[in-house]
Amino acid sequence: MCPGNWLWASMTFMARFSRSSSRSPVRTRGNLEEMPTVQHPFLNVFELERLLYTGKTACNHADEVWPGLYLGDQDMANNRRELRRLGITHVLNASHSRWRGTPEAYEGLGIRYLGVEAHDSPAFDMSIHFQTAADFIHRALSQPGGKILVHCAVGVSRSATLVLAYLMLYHHLTLVEAIKKVKDHRGIIPNRGFLRQLLALDRRLRQGLEA
């Protein structure tokens, strides 16, 4: 299971969702689990939150959510033995700071590192990092034997948002498809601001395909 922060995050999410639901009724257009692959025209952040809270909610310190792509927490990023055992070649830290994460931490392991200074706040613009992070993940998985750990503190919001953006940008999944794919393997809860930014990316990508 995830560290104790996961329980706190789940409780926070449920409280936030309950309050928002009481204020703003959610428009429903059928079961989200049965939503077609084409982006649903009425999809909104509240419906995404409902989807995120269905299905798998448990997680380990790291879970393989796509071939060679592990989504995890800070504990896994600090565990050199586990990184070596999994064959991790790249690390993307979505909670990089002066006190958390440096390339030097992986000296001797041959691991390439990218740090993204992101705050888990709805007001933070994570979208400015979507392409850079997706490119780094793509390069990691394109090399022979490449495996990447994408992590933040708990591995459910910042890092999950970047993984979803990668699946949308490089594998042309809709946001709903990307969420379902990740949730097959790990529970995630991107904050509401990140969900809005992913929705904007989804609309832009869908419009590009239709042009």
From Swiss-Prot:
EC number(s) reported in the record: 3.1.3.16, 3.1.3.48
One GO term describing the cellular component: nucleoplasm
Main location: cytoplasm
Key words, A-Z: Cytoplasm, Golgi apparatus, Hydrolase, Nucleus, Protein phosphatase
Cellular compartment(s): Cytoplasm; Nucleus; Golgi apparatus
Domain of life, per lineage: Eukaryota
Catalytic activity: O-phospho-L-tyrosyl-[protein] + H2O = L-tyrosyl-[protein] + phosphate; O-phospho-L-seryl-[protein] + H2O = L-seryl-[protein] + phosphate; O-phospho-L-threonyl-[protein] + H2O = L-threonyl-[protein] + phosphate
One matching Pfam family: DSPc
GO terms of biological process kind: negative regulation of ERK1 and ERK2 cascade; negative regulation of transcription by RNA polymerase II; positive regulation of cell adhesion
Name recorded for this polypeptide: Dual specificity protein phosphatase 26
Species per Swiss-Prot/TrEMBL record: Pongo abelii
